[in-house]
Amino acid sequence: PAASFAAVATQLLADGARVLVVGDDSDVPAADEIVAGARGAVSWAGVVDLPDLAPLLSLADLVLGNDSGPRHLAAAVGAPTVGVFWVGNAINAAPLGRQRHRVQVSWTTHCPVCGVDATQVGWTAPRCEHDVTFVGDVRVSTVLDDVRAVLASTR
């Protein structure tokens, strides 16, 4: 959730980091929420096109993000990452090493609204209509610990 990313960004800004939020046009509302909650963070969401994103990410000391294209792209261009993954996606797509990449996993397996078992969607269960986060149980403190640990080991 954007509020959690804002909380991490606030702590990193207090540590002296510079925080840049990126994403496509659909990410602008969340980026705006992050920047509003973390004074000093800057949003380029909806501004940086995909061809320009790879070189930008390669310059980052660290990229924090959900299990998303930009987080995977950051890892591909050599940037250290901390990713927030839902358990089903972590099994298939999370990085395995821990020195340059860390993974925070949400173990939520059922929709918090209707209870549909998300591990069976596409197999025995239809997708529910609720647009809710499945990573809300990932704690800000553990993400921040991983961010600081990766930064310390890669600088």
Mark where each language-model region is.
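Donor-binding and catalytic core of enzymes assembling or modifying cell-surface/extracellular glycoconjugates
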Residues: A2-G88
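Nucleotide-sugar donor-binding patch of glycosyltransferase catalytic domains
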Residues: V35, S43-W44, A75-T154
